[in-house]
Amino acid sequence: SALKNVIYLCKLIKNVYFCNSLTTVLINRFMINRVLIRLKIIQIVYAYYQNGSKNLDSAEKELFFSLSKAYDLYNYLLMLMVALTTYAQKRIDAAKAKLASTAEELYPNMKFVENKFVSQLEVNKQLLDFVANQKRSWTNDEDFIKGLYEKIIASDIYKEYMASPDKSYETDRELWRKLYKAFIFNNEALDTLLEDQSLYWNDDKEIVDTFVLKTIKRFEEKNGANQTLLPEFKDEEDQEFARRLFRRAILNCDYYRHLISENTRNWDLDRVAFMDVIIMQCALAEILSFPNIPVSVSLNEYVEIAKVYSTIKSGSFVNGTLDGIVNQLKKEGKLTKN
């Protein structure tokens, strides 16, 4: 499909450092923020033009479905830590049940399976609500869980934790922050597994990983099962931002492309990378449709996206073209904000 093609394209050319550093700066108290919204809109707008039907309502539904799938992945990755702990407990139970169990098997070190952070996560009300409404679970991927668990228990991170007498909540939480960064964050086997489960997750993992790490850091023992997870959207304003930006980018396409063409006269627009055109089209939709967002903020966001999601020279090309358009619109009195 067109969407699959663009997600594959983005996966090939994206820069992990960019995704991690950008989201680290901008995520605070909510999962889906405007960084992710902009990226998703560019993908969906790209797919819209690659798809012959060009149905605006269907494309908008696809946008919000895609955003909701990113939030599903966030919850699913939180569940992975619980699944690994559950598997560890099963291993302990199986070893105890053997006819000739060793002393170590009969009286194992329970520190990992009794980890206070995971115990809190396991009973988290919001996560349990998610689990109750999902057919998907990690129980169908026991081979993957087994392999990941064995890598964890062979690691120095695990061994040092198990040998330490420190049983504080903070130490338990820090263990999972370290394990997540070491074994889940950049895990090709997990990436493949998730890609097989959902097309949308292929391009979301690295960004969502950052949200999960942020969540681990925010957990506090005193909050118990009521610890809040990151909400899907900050508020209705961000949902409206996504809807309005997407529709303006499509409905005002001819005007935006006219502006782009006027400011790339030394270029044949057909020879400009199509992804660059889409990025600039979305950037102009934002600059001209949202008076409260400073021009510099929009320019910086889309130039950074171009550096990662298009060609090597796209960042400077998009920056120069958009800067020229902004100056032109200001001279004509069509753009008054700074």
What do these predicted ranges mean?
Residues 1-6:
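Hydrophobic alpha-helical membrane-insertion segments
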Residues 7-11, 17-27, 41:
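Short, positively charged and aromatic/hydrophobic N-terminal segments
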Residues 24-338:
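Class I Rossmann-like S-adenosyl-L-methionine
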